[in-house]
């Protein structure tokens, strides 16, 4: 049963005194929205739920009128630290080997499409956790290739290939009917 409840993380006595003064005549910035990340592991687990339970949960989370009304979703380009496995969309050297992987096709895309059917105005932001390992070097002063998921830097010799990697990824999601609002390097 999905119900809303108030959660008290501490009593008022435990909080330091705080005053927030709002002046509606002064505006410093605007809030564009709030959101959530969905990862391969998240989507895998959501797909283990009964379809009606999953749809109810996603509605409570993403619907403008029946839920929190999140306005953004962040997804990973390739694997993240919450993926089922380590991969990029181009693990074999050469950008011509680019392809969406099973985690994206089997888990992320179906959940993302279900979320967008609930709230089609959600903006999708994508960020890579890592570039393909064949694009990595130990450091920008030591261009020794580095076979690592978590360390290293992008070899300047592969800047164009990495840009193409981003473009191919956006195009692959567009081909699945998913518009990407923004990508961010990491």
Label each residue range with its predicted role.
Residues 185-186:
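Short, conserved phosphate-binding/catalytic loop or strand-edge motifs used
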Residues 2-180:
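N-terminal catalytic cores of secreted or lumenal carbohydrate-active enzymes
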């Amino acid at each position: 049963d999905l119900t809303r409840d108030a959660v008290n993380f501490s009593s008022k006595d435990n909080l330091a005194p705080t005053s927030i003064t709002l002046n509606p005549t002064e505006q410093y910035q605007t809030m564009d929205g709030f959101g959530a990340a969905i990862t391969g592991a998240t989507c895998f687990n959501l797909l283990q739920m009964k379809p009606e339970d999953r749809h109810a949960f996603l509605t409570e989370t993403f619907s403008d009128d029946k839920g929190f009304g999140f306005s953004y979703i962040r997804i990973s380009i390739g694997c993240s630290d919450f993926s089922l496995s380590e991969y990029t969309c181009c693990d074999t050297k050469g950008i011509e080997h680019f392809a969406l992987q099973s985690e994206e096709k089997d888990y992320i895309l179906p959940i993302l499409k279900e979320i967008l059917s609930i709230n089609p105005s959600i903006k999708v932001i994508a960020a890579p956790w890592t570039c393909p390992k064949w694009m990595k070097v130990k450091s920008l002063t030591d261009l020794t290739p580095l076979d690592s998921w978590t360390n290293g830097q992008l070899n300047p010799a592969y800047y164009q290939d990495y840009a193409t990697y981003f473009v191919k990824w956006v195009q692959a999601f567009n081909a699945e009917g998913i518009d990407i609002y923004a990508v961010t390097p990491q």
